[in-house]
């Protein structure tokens, strides 16, 4: 099992999974993450959850930090 969070970049967009590292991240928070398109700002729609490694595209990109208002 691997820990993941689900992040959206648009209101009704696809959910992307990221590695939360050791951060305490919950649903509703905003995060800065590393994506294939560079560093982006997203909204957490799925808090830290354990998932089977086969269901997640590896390697997961990390959360850089929790976004501040």
Language model segments and positions:
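Short aromatic-glycine-enriched beta-strand elements
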Residues: 2-6
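Short, structured beta-strand/loop micro-motifs enriched in basic residues and often containing a Trp
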Residues: 7-17
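A generic structural motif
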Residues: 12-13, 36-39
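Short, well-ordered loop/turn sites that connect or cap secondary structure elements
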Residues: 24-25
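Terminal, basic amphipathic appendages of nucleotide-handling enzymes
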Residues: 38-69
């Amino acid at each position: 099992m691997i820990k993941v969070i689900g992040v959206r970049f648009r209101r009704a967009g696809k959910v992307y999974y990221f590695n939360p590292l050791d951060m305490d991240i919950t649903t509703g928070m905003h995060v800065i993450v590393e994506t294939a398109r560079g560093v982006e700002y997203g909204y957490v729609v799925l808090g830290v959850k354990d998932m089977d490694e086969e269901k997640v595209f590896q390697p997961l990109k990390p959360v850089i930090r929790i976004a501040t208002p």
